[in-house]
């Protein structure tokens, strides 16, 4: 089975917008994150277990608005008793089966249902402010939040502070619209798509 990326028809490589005469650290970089395993884990209301007792690849399930991660895997809090697990590891399914009980958690494979765009650069928060009503001055590395971007429901994962890097996730069916919104907002600063 061949996997077709959600942005296959729109993600064009190259430099665009107001990039001429600028250093690489002054423009926005945009890339599609693909070939990730994505699972949603929801603790049942009837579950008596403490989430602090569970780990995936030695990562704890984080508290409100937090992310725990390493080089291959990130666990995002997306709501009360609700998390996304993103991993480049082919063994994520096995790790989840080994560590989480179907009697305690609803576990759903979302690997083909999300579009993920990674943005970085010093003007990143200005790009986000153009379409999202969140106070980005309060958000830092290893935090996550659900919001909207120009009317599209998104999840934001703040991956790094230096350079400022965020992953924006939406449903696959909104991926192209989100991509157009983000790239349009980036034209003012110039952007390079990888």
Region locations from a protein language model:
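Basic, glycine/lysine-rich polyanion-binding surfaces/domains
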Residues: 1-194
């Amino acid at each position: 089975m061949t996997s077709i990326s959600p942005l296959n028809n729109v993600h064009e490589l190259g430099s665009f917008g107001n990039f001429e005469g600028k250093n690489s650290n002054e423009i926005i970089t945009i890339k599609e994150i693909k070939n990730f395993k994505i699972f949603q884990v929801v603790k049942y209301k009837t579950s008596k277990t403490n989430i602090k007792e569970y780990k995936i690849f030695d990562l704890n399930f984080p508290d409100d608005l937090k992310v725990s991660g390493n080089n291959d895997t990130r666990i995002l809090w997306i709501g009360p008793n609700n998390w996304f697990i993103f991993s480049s590891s082919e063994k994520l399914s096995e790790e989840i089966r080994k560590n989480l009980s179907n009697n305690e958690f609803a576990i759903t494979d979302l690997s083909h249902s999300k579009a993920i765009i990674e943005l970085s650069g010093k003007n990143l928060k200005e790009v986000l402010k153009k379409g999202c009503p969140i106070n980005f001055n309060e958000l830092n590395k290893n935090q996550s939040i659900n919001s909207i971007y120009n009317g599209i429901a998104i999840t934001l994962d703040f991956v790094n502070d230096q350079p400022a890097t965020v992953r924006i996730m939406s449903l696959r069916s909104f991926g192209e619209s989100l991509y157009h919104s983000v790239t349009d907002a980036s034209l003012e600063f110039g952007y390079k798509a990888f």
